[in-house]
A protein has these predicted regions:
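ATP-binding/phosphotransfer module of carbohydrate and carboxylate kinases, centering on a glycine-rich
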Residues: 1-4, 24, 52, 179-288, ...
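Short glycine-rich, Thr/Ser-proximal phosphate-binding strand/loop in the N-terminal lobe
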Residues: 2-71, 166-189, 196-197, 208
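Short beta-strand scaffold segments in enzyme catalytic cores
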Residues: 12-18, 149, 156-161
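Phosphate/pyrophosphate-binding loops at sites that engage ATP/ADP/AMP, CoA/4′-phosphopantetheine
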Residues: 65-81, 225-239
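Conserved phosphate-binding catalytic cores of ATP/NTP-utilizing and phosphoryl-transfer enzymes
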Residues: 117-147, 271-278
Length: 307
């Protein structure tokens, strides 16, 4: 089976996928991760979300991951492949050692040179984060194009994919959580409040004022950027707009533009990237990128600009 790790600044999300030809037997008892919600993807056997800690040791991460498997009656021996998308370089070496020590697998990292199948029409494709790349690949595979992905995490990322499956670019905004943190850290007399959707915009006390401004102000940011993206794409373009990320369910319901919520989109993108690269990298280590002259538009790689 394939273990996919989406390593973000705040959380690390793990997904366990069945691969074609796998026969996991009784080890996988259901597609429920314990949260009461089964996976929309029948190949996703289980998934977990943990806090990303840069100071965790190899053994601390290893014990944590093994315990997650054991809590769901899954043996770590079912893992034959691992793919990692990380935006936290300090933990990369630690996670590689975790994979080798506790799963006996040499992981594949999403990094420059990986085959994406998506032309990158941007100035510097190597700047695109691994999680953003996975989002784009999964969104186009699942919804077709044109489409827009809004990933709500520590930062909120907007990704735009054309009707032909080309990555056109996007935008990055401070996430809802760090936006609120900035307010509380710079305004000494304001009391920190829980971030949640208030019942009305016009608050009647300081807590209500803050929750309204933070939440509905952020909805305005999201819809404002989406409206401008749609304007640049032109009136004849009607992209499918999907939200993902840890805060997607909280925010997307109030958006005027977001049509779907797909919380497993990044993990699905990692699964797709693994399938596209498993033969080229049988042990999961990144190989040297092919010469730029070999990159076809339908087989673009990170680090190669197409078009």
């Amino acid at each position: 089976m394939l273990l996919a790790l989406d390593v973000g600044n705040t959380n690390t999300v793990l997904g366990l996928y069945g691969l074609e030809g796998d026969n996991p037997g009784p080890a996988i008892v259901s597609a429920d991760n314990g949260s009461g919600e089964g996976s929309a993807n029948p190949r996703l056997a289980a998934h977990w979300r943990v806090t990303t800690h840069r100071a965790r040791t190899v053994d601390e991460y290893g014990v944590l991951f093994v315990n997650l498997f054991e809590m769901h009656g899954i043996s770590t021996s079912v893992v034959t492949h691992i793919i990692i998308a990380s935006v936290v370089p300090p933990v990369d070496s630690t996670l590689r050692q975790v994979c080798e020590k506790y799963f006996h697998v040499d992981p594949m990292f999403v990094e420059p040179g990986i085959k994406t199948g998506m032309p990158m029409l941007v100035d510097n494709p190597t700047e695109l984060g691994a999680d953003r790349l996975a989002d784009c690949v999964a969104a186009y595979a699942r919804y077709g194009g044109p489409c827009i992905v809004v990933d709500f995490g520590t930062a909120t990322k907007f990704e735009v994919i054309s009707a032909r499956g080309e990555y056109l670019g996007g935008a990055i905004s401070p996430g809802l959580g760090i936006s609120a943190d900035a307010l509380f850290s710079h305004a000494a007399r304001l009391t920190r409040v829980d971030i949640k959707r208030p019942s009305k915009v016009i608050g009647t006390n300081t807590i209500g004022h803050l929750q309204s401004g933070i939440f509905f102000g952020y909805i305005g940011l999201v819809d404002g950027i989406l409206e401008r993206i749609l304007g640049e794409l032109g009136a004849g373009t009607q992209p499918h707009i999907v939200a993902t990320g840890g805060l997607a369910r909280m925010i997307a319901a109030d958006s005027r533009f977001i049509q779907d919520i797909d919380e497993m989109l990044t993990l699905e993108g990692l699964r797709i990237l693994f399938e596209r690269n498993r033969n080229a990298r049988p042990r999961g280590r990144a190989q040297e990128a092919r010469s730029s002259g070999q990159g076809a538009r339908t087989e673009a790689r990170v680090g190669e600009r197409q078009g």
